[in-house]
């Protein structure tokens, strides 16, 4: 909420500067975001009147202007602007002046003709030109000559930008901030000026009817203004609107915006001749209805959206935006001023559904005080007469079925002292509360606090205590040590394992990825999950952020593919990622919370293959002390490439899956690289982890290494080959490493060549070649016999 200090001073007197005021208001609970003084960089720029315009003798696009700047003689300025004429009043930067951005203006020559300054456009003064008018800034014809431009345009008027919390809609107004200012610095607050008279002869109740058909409209007020003159607002009003961040349009629209900023109550003006039925109806829209708003956008409505209607015809979305057909135009002669109060929750939901958030909806959704409607309407009528913009027809329509009444909170003043840790008298508390217009009566040790209707946030005794603390001063509340019992705790086993897993995977060259646990139900189609798969049985979120976040994930494969796809779209040639997250499995018993499983997901693409992924997994389980894992063919997982996927097992229990992602899945994520992914059940892994380490003496005897390369049928798993080698190698086979799998021209069709490096060591003696050859031959013969292998 931007509040010009000059506007604030209409309602409260103070002689401190904007910085000090901002600091004091922040300490009392009205947080100041920033203080803006737009004219700080502007010096020696004044208003000037163009007396004469002559052509430049040597340049067709330049003209020579004689400009009166309030001195003894006019000055000569050469310009290329085309939008001015004689007698126009413009900003003039004199010799030696400075402009925003550090621009300095000096005397000079343009094509041989002396120019003693520069006439300025809006942009050159640092003013946003929302109408995109090319050329000089033309000022009001009544602007005095030779005046400092900062004073004329209000650029020397500081603006304080407040961060208003949702529980204080009363502070979304100048008078709300004025109340806070008066209470904070302990001075008087002046109410907004209400002073107008009605014109006799016609009565609104004889020519306009209002029917409220829905409780979502809590109050509806209307007045008719006749003999309306549509013109520009006076400079003082335009200045205040612009400083508050609102673009001036015309006097009628500006009055509604001015009142909204000043009082905090949104208003709307209808062109009366467009309300052809002479009856305004407030009711909900019908599903599927179309309506074109003031911004020329056609919007689709539903039965939750509250509408303002001209009989049966829609003319405004209640509390959000008016319609294009009933807006005030240059030929408008009579208007209907609307000042109403609508249900805040409904306005917020409708605004979100329509993707249409306005200054009005932003206020209504915070539940405004219905009594503001009358103040705003009367203030608008006062401004109509002040600006001589029309005449107020006699009578007012006011439908207010359930009146809002002040709330009463009773609290013991001793409780407030104990709650805040201070010690002040009940009389002092009463003074603070009265300054905030929270009328207070002392009854013994009790304070009876009457909360006005504009303070909807005062409901319980803690609210009253907060108000006392704000004005007393948070900085005066003595600091105390919080009494607590220190409890020594450590990380749980799962937390410890997660930390270890993270360290292992990072040391393996992977980067951690973090993803949402809520996803779209459409992800199962992207990863080719069958319709009857248990993975599609998901936990649904009751109040989701949107369809893309409406269910809890049962697999992390989509999340990893999303992360890989994001890296690929940013032209990363190589990505190696991991995530430690959860999946959520619905309970079989209705009403029970879902089962959560911890999952490790590893994904990579680029200059990598299946064996890189497998190596990361094997390194992980080896460091975690998980023994005897095995691999088996996975033929029923459509997310993965058939024939290039395996399940990881501990004994006979499936620990996870790893393999190459199916090309169709990669295509669904627009990744034109082969992707490799592993999904491992961390909870099951945890049951088999052994982080304890035993000392083992360094070996005394050397190793002997032999390579072996065999041809086997294509469908034989590498795991089967390794199982045979390990059994026959016995205790002296220290390790075996797969270093090649080949299918090609030199290998018969239907076969593959598999090559291993076998490392032997005997802990009790040095192995001879004869010892090794004996075991090596035993391995080869068993491979030939069991798997039909051929030695290459």
From Swiss-Prot:
Keywords, alphabetical: Aminoacyl-tRNA synthetase, ATP-binding, Cytoplasm, Ligase, Magnesium, Metal-binding, Nucleotide-binding, Protein biosynthesis, RNA-binding, tRNA-binding
Q: What is its EC number?
A: 6.1.1.20
Question: tRNA-binding domain: which residues?
Answer: 39-150
A Pfam family of this chain: FDX-ACB
Please name the InterPro entries in this protein's record: aa-tRNA-synth_II/BPL/LPL, B3/B4_tRNA-bd, DNA-bd_dom_put_sf, Fdx_antiC-bd, Fdx_antiC-bd_sf, NA-bd_OB-fold, Phe-tRNA-ligase_IIc_bsu, Phe-tRNA-ligase_IIc_bsu_bact
Subcellular location field: Cytoplasm
Q: What class of enzyme is it?
A: ligase
> Could you state one GO cellular component term attached to this entry?
phenylalanine-tRNA ligase complex
Catalytic activity annotation: tRNA(Phe) + L-phenylalanine + ATP = L-phenylalanyl-tRNA(Phe) + AMP + diphosphate + H(+)
Q: Where is the B5 domain?
A: 404-479
| Top-rank taxon, per record | Bacteria
Q: Where is the FDX-ACB domain?
A: 699-792
Name the coenzymes or cofactors required: Mg(2+)
- GO MF assignments: ATP binding; catalytic activity, acting on a protein; magnesium ion binding; phenylalanine-tRNA ligase activity; transferase activity; tRNA binding
Read off the Gene3D superfamilies from this record. 3.30.56.10, Bira Bifunctional Protein, Domain 2 (3.30.930.10), Ferrodoxin-fold anticodon-binding domain (3.30.70.380), Nucleic acid-binding proteins (2.40.50.140), Phenylalanyl-trna Synthetase, Chain B, domain 3 (3.50.40.10)
Provide the assembly information. Tetramer of two alpha and two beta subunits.
Q: Which family does it belong to?
A: Belongs to the phenylalanyl-tRNA synthetase beta subunit family. Type 1 subfamily.
HAMAP family from the entry?
Phe_tRNA_synth_beta1
Designated name of the protein: Phenylalanine--tRNA ligase beta subunit
Q: Which gene encodes it?
A: pheT
